[in-house]
Amino acid sequence: MFKIVYPNAKDFFSFINSITNVTDSIILNFTEDGIFSRHLTEDKVLMAIMRIPKDVLSEYSIDSPTSVKLDVSSVKKILSKASSKKATIELTETDSGLKIIIRDEKSGAKSTIYIKAEKGQVEQLTEPKVNLAVNFTTDESVLNVIAADVTLVGEEMRISTEEDKIKIEAGEEGKRYVAFLMKDKPLKELSIDTSASSSYSAEMFKDAVKGLRGFSAPTMVSFGENLPMKIDVEAVSGGHMIFWIAPRL
């Protein structure tokens, strides 16, 4: 049996909503270190990882590691109840699945929902082990504009370094998109260890950026020479939502 309390119900369901961009069912793994969920698209191009360490949880108790598989439609029924940042969310294991309590700490209002879930063994949390030479941080709104633009002109986007700038391009002659990103214009941070360039699916980039919605925090994007792109946002109340996009070689 397990019981966890996360201090921000809105952030927690932003995690869940992000994963639904990749899968129709969600597997939550409860371990001694915290909670994680990892999902791949069928073509194995896009990976979504939710990772919430136990030290950011208001309460965390677990008898033994376990996983629960939830249907997305069931989870989305309760998303509307988690609109307040003042609300906490409590997950408790039951014989048939999960009991979810959303409690508004300001008003004292409480909602309790029971969801059926398939229980199983904890999955292995594996992700690409690569050294990414380029890292930059910006707001989700900036990435959202880029994602919308590149998908309008082509199926593939190319990202590269050019001196102290990031260059993003897509499309062919006559229908082409080019953007340059620099420190403070509009990047918050920029680190280039070595020059690099790589190409990715524009649609998968758009799907990953869509998964960032709901997190009011800057996003870090990392890439290397023909290596997977990593998109990482840390929730205000703790925990990371990470997307990996395989390169087009």
UniProtKB/Swiss-Prot annotation:
Keyword flag Membrane: no
Similarity comment text for this entry: Belongs to the PCNA family.
Protein function: One of the sliding clamp subunits that acts as a moving platform for DNA processing. Responsible for tethering the catalytic subunit of DNA polymerase to DNA during high-speed replication. Heterotrimer stimulates the Holliday junction resolvase Hjc. DNA polymerase I, DNA ligase and the flap endonuclease may be constitutively associated with the PCNA heterotrimer forming a scanning complex able to couple DNA synthesis and Okazaki fragment maturation.
InterPro entries tied to this protein: DNA_clamp_sf, Pr_cel_nuc_antig, Pr_cel_nuc_antig_N
Keyword hit for DNA-binding: yes
A GO biological-process term: leading strand elongation
The name this protein goes by in its record: DNA polymerase sliding clamp 1
NCBIfam families: PRK01115.1-1
Source species, domain of life: Archaea
UniProt entry keywords in alphabetical sequence: DNA replication, DNA-binding
Record's subunit section: Forms heterodimers with PCNA2, which then recruit PCNA3; does not form homotrimers. The heterodimers interact with RfcS homotetramers. Heterotrimer which circularizes head-to-tail (head is at N-terminus, tail is at C-terminus) to form a toroid; DNA passes through its center. Replication factor C (RFC) is required to load the toroid on the DNA. Heterotrimer interacts, probably via this subunit, with flap endonuclease 1 (fen), Hjc, Dpo4, and XPF.
UniProt GO MF annotations: DNA binding; DNA polymerase processivity factor activity
Organism: Saccharolobus solfataricus (strain ATCC 35092 / DSM 1617 / JCM 11322 / P2) (Sulfolobus solfataricus)
Coiled-coil regions, chain positions: none
